[in-house]
Structures are given as structure tokens and as C-alpha cells.
Amino acid sequence: MMNATTSSTEERLSVGNIELEVIRRGVGRSVLLLHGMQNIDPRARFLDLLGGRAAMIAPSHPGFGHSARPADFDTVYDLVHLYLDVLETLPSERVTLVGLSFGGWLAAEIAVKCCHRIDRLVLVDAFGIKISDRETPDILDVFNTSPQEVQRRSWHDPGKWAPDFNAMSDDELVVRARNWEALCLYGWHPYMYNPQLQRWLRRITRPTLVLWGASDGIVQPSYGRAYSALIPGARFELIAEAGHHPEIEQPEAFVDRIVAFLDQ
């Protein structure tokens, strides 16, 4: 399969003395895409499909991919404030914000703080809230679960889509390790959620689509339904035969759902 952490893209974006590697695709309506637990492979099919309908920019978060992380940059709120700055640099007055997995948490936080720069919001298998009791985990602890089990629960068809680490280049392996380290730094405690976010999701006033892989074993569809119910007017949709990465396993269905939402 296509690995999820290929070599650096050529483009860079400088914001507030932080330099981010970015992927750009397409023309038209502006879309800011925030990646999940791994940075986005520029060969991913969904990029070209979505780029056929929108002008998309997909940065690698500081510490992920080939984006450097400043020494004092270590919380989700550093990321949120960075992307608030990124929104101010984009030429469009309003953009569609799409967040995948961990990036969905960031997107929700940004939308709570800054709806005036957002046209529409798409959350895809997003982290960020706590819906169960204190003793019941909502999100699989990927750091304390065997790699084999993480892969099994990440994909509808892991035999087809799980990354082959033996086939990765040295650069890809280094990037994947950097991604894992950065994810742990930003999201370890509390694990992948903000205790206050659930209360403030009511502040999101822009049209919102919550997309979920029907076979997601990292964070179950029931979590996605609960997430959607906390955002006024949000719509929840499942993508069949997809796990935690519907943009990879079902790129056509993923893009079709987003384009239909944008066209409404």
C-alpha cells in the first residue's frame, strides 16, 4: 500500500516564525486540511479528488512530517493558536476547515474560538471530547496497545491498507517516529481530549458535517454521533467499509460527501 508518511513536499509556509511544510492542490473554494496522527502522504488519492473542487492547503503540524517544532511549542493550544494565525494569512475571508482524527480535535477547538473565519466545518473521526465515565476510555490508547492491534482497529481492511514498515525508506521511518513523538507530546494527558471542549461546542455556528468510518476501532461511531449532537445543526454521516481513515480507504466516497456538503 501507499505509506502514510512519505518524504517532504517542496512548499513551505512561514507563520509567526514557524515554518510548516505544506501540500497544496486545486483551485476554487479555500479548504484548510488538518491531518491526524500521521502527516498526509502527498500521493494520497483523496488530495487530487478534493483538489478538483477546491483550493486546498494541508500543513504538517510542528513536530510532524518535516515541520520543525519550537522547543517551547508543546500543547494543543499552541497548535490551535498557530492555525488561527494561518487562517489570517489565507486570502479567502472564510475557509472550509477539515480536520482528520487528531486534526479534527484541532478543527473543533478552532471553530469554537473563531467561527467568523470559517465557512463550513468537517470533522472526520475526530478526537477531542470525553463522553464516557472516567473509567471507560473513548479513544484507543495507541501508545499502550500493540502495533498489530492498532493496525487491526485502524482499518476496515488492514490486509490492504495497513502500512508495511519493512517497505518504508529510512526517511519515512524517521518521519513516522517524529509524528508519534509529537502526537504523544500534544495529546498524552489528558489522553486526546480537552475536558472543557464539550461544554463549548455549542459556540460553533457554522454548518458542520461529522464524517465517520463505519468500521473505526480507534474511536467508535457512537462517539461521533455524540460529538455531532453537541454541535448545533451538525449532520452525522457514516462511510461504509472504512475504518479510522475513510479518506484513504474510501477516497471517492469521502470526497463526494464533502463536495455535496460544500455545494449545499
Residue ranges and their predicted role:
Residues A234-Q264:
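Catalytic active-site module of serine/aspartate enzymes centered on a nucleophile-bearing elbow/loop
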Residues F46, L197, R206, Q220-A229:
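Short alpha-helix in the alpha/beta-hydrolase fold that links the catalytic acid
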Residues I204, V210-W212:
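Short beta-strand/loop motif that positions the catalytic acidic residue
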Residues G16-H66:
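Conserved HGGG/HGGXW glycine-rich cap/lid loop of the alpha/beta-hydrolase fold
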Residues D170-R199, R203:
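Hydrophobic, aromatic-rich cap/lid helix
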Residues I57-V98, I248, D256:
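Active-site loop/oxyanion-hole signature of alpha/beta-hydrolase fold enzymes
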